[in-house]
């Protein structure tokens, strides 16, 4: 047993003994438990409360916005160069593309998934351009400037911009890989109920991760089915004269893919792809049927967009069901992995 003499209280001596895990002090037959243990407990409690107060704002931020991944400074500093707008940080460019390509009122996880796809495509373009950050000419029209965002969103500009910025920050530095290479990451608005197999569309085995995926909810979208009436050019009159018209009613769909999108169509003596026909006559989709109608051609389309990759509508529906962006991307891009852009930055 350890024994110690203390003169800590008013200069008077106390005989203290160590026992049962604490000091016991006696004076005049009355025991006094030494206060050091009590003080120590109070200090610990105060420290815990202080730690909670310091960390609480961070915890709330992570709960609302998700954790922010810190990437290498070189990746953060990557610049892209486009002709009319000069140089800008790659993440700033991605915000402009996200603003143009997906409605800002979509769910957070859908926006996050879209952000990863956009960043991946931008780095693919940088690699293909030789790594100096110069983007192809068409990239000029693929993003919105601040002026365009303000024009489109009006009073909701600040709110919408913050949402898109959060999507880029929540997925900071993340890109989609297939094996050792950046994946091709196409997306579109709305399917006919299924996405398309890239091999059927492009005739290449190059993208085995772009397969047919069910999107059952897409068929319930308001703009799933659209109808366009095409007039024969020679018959156009009045206000319709000069608008896009078809050369002849002698039109035949010659080939479709396994989910119903047109691969080949004949218009008179000319044969073109379904996507060419869609673009020429400004159709929502190359999944369409044809029907003569009072000397005109009625074209009924299903879905919106080319149909390859991620259906934004289904991605948003998945996000509404609390599915995260990683699960969304895995659903549409089979066999791919999300990796850090730092794994390729040395080659950029």
Question: Model regions: which residues?
Answer:
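Conserved, single-site charged/polar hotspot
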Residues: 5, 9-348
């Amino acid at each position: 047993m350890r024994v110690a003499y203390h003169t800590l209280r008013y200069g008077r001596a106390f005989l203290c003994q160590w026992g049962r895990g604490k000091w016991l002090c006696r004076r005049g037959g009355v025991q006094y438990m030494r206060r050091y243990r009590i003080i120590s407990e109070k200090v610990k409690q105060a420290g815990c409360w202080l730690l909670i107060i310091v960390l609480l704002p961070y915890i709330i931020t992570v709960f609302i916005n998700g954790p922010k991944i810190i990437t290498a400074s070189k990746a953060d500093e990557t610049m892209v160069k486009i002709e009319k707008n000069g140089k800008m940080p790659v993440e700033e460019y991605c915000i402009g593309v996200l603003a143009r390509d997906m409605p800002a009122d979509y769910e957070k996880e859908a926006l996050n998934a879209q952000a990863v796809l956009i960043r991946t495509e931008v780095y693919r373009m940088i690699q293909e351009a030789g790594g100096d950050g110069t983007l192809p000419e068409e990239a000029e029209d693929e993003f919105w400037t601040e002026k365009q965002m303000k024009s489109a969103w009006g009073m909701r500009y600040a709110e919408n911009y913050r949402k898109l910025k959060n999507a880029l920050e929540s997925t900071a530095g993340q890109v989609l890989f297939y094996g050792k290479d950046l994946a091709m990451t196409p997306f579109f608005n709305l399917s006919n109920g299924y996405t398309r197999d890239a091999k059927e569309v492009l005739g290449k085995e190059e993208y085995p991760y772009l397969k047919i995926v069910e999107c059952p909810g897409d068929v319930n979208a308001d703009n799933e089915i659209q109808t366009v009436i095409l007039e024969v050019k020679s018959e156009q009159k009045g206000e319709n004269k000069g608008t896009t018209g078809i050369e002849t009613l002698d039109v035949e769909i010659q080939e479709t893919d396994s989910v119903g999108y047109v691969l080949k169509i004949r218009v008179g003596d000319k044969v073109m792809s379904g996507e060419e026909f869609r673009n020429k006559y400004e159709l929502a989709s190359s999944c369409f049927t044809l029907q003569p109608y009072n000397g005109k051609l009625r074209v009924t389309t299903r879905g919106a967009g080319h149909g390859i990759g991620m259906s934004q509508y289904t991605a948003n529906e998945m996000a509404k069901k609390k599915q995260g962006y990683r699960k969304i991307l895995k659903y549409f891009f089979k066999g791919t992995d999300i990796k850090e852009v730092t794994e390729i930055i040395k080659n950029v």
